[in-house]
Amino acid sequence: MTYRPTIFRVERETVGTMENEIAPIVERELRASPDSIEQIEEGLLHETYEISCDGEEYVLQLSSEGDEGEADALRRGLNCYVMLQDTEVPVPAIVTEEIRAFDRGWYSLVEKLPGKTGKLDISPRKVRNAARYLAKIHDVRSFETSGWVRFEDREPSIRPFQDGSLRRWILRTVEETSTTLGGGGIESAGSALERVFEREGAALPDEFAPVFCHNDFTPDNVLFENEEVVGILDFDRAHASHAQRDLVKAANGFWMHDPGAEWDVQTTFYEGYREVGELDGSFASNEPLYRVETLAWTVAGLLELDELSAYEKEFYTEKLLAAIDRIEDVSP
């Protein structure tokens, strides 16, 4: 009940045009020809390749020419890796310290980390360990305002949300999400979402200390070896935000990779986070709102990609309505 990733192996004799484009990049950066090129298709924002060269492995990401949003995301992700090099957060070592131009856009090159992503293989231990590292990410940097992370001379700066605050940004996206749910065959959940945030949206926190947030912390972006975290990937969507929201969104993301688990994925994630990070008393009232908002946003994204079957639509309708009922249960 989540993205269905596929990986296409590109052999040297069939690489053709792709090799003609990528090999020169590799030769320029590594001063050697690639031994193999493997294209990765996992719903990634960028065109991504795993490169083997002289016994070492690398990851090359490309953004399309003319797509400034994609180039900004590539730049943000690479700069986040640079910022995190000397922290407890395990990120890839950098080959290109800034994104570089090629014939049809921009690229970045980093060393490939060991381990495998969680994907559809999560466990209580993996979930706890991942949550601990999310707490470490939140401890990297604090900011004076919330918004999108940008970099100027390697230093992070913030472009405030266009709506003026995280709360107003959430309320606007909830309106868009409810419309998407309704148009995608999840009408009852879309209508209930709109109603509950019209009534309870003012309770969303507007006063908090913004911290560095991954904003896409899912099993797809966490590497494990023997259930231990050995790498964290893809900071392209990083922003300065409320740690509690990033935590809840991440817990939803891990739950969605095994929604039929007989153990409580979200609670386990929160417990792991608390082993490293702090959650004050406001979490009990904020969590139900953030859970509904971030879950609905993710489901809407899957609908837009036509990724949900009729059964999955019914399943997520039930889960969204149950999550909305939790808001009503905790509301004064």
Where are these regions (language model features)?
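Active-site acidic catalytic loop and adjacent metal/ATP-binding pocket
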Residues: 44-52, 60, 197-245
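ATP/Mg2+ or Mg2+-diphosphate-binding catalytic cores
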Residues: 7-11, 298-332
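Short secondary-structure junctions
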Residues: 26-35, 86-90, 277
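Active-site activation/catalytic loop segments of kinase-like enzymes and analogous catalytic loops
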Residues: 245-278, 291-308
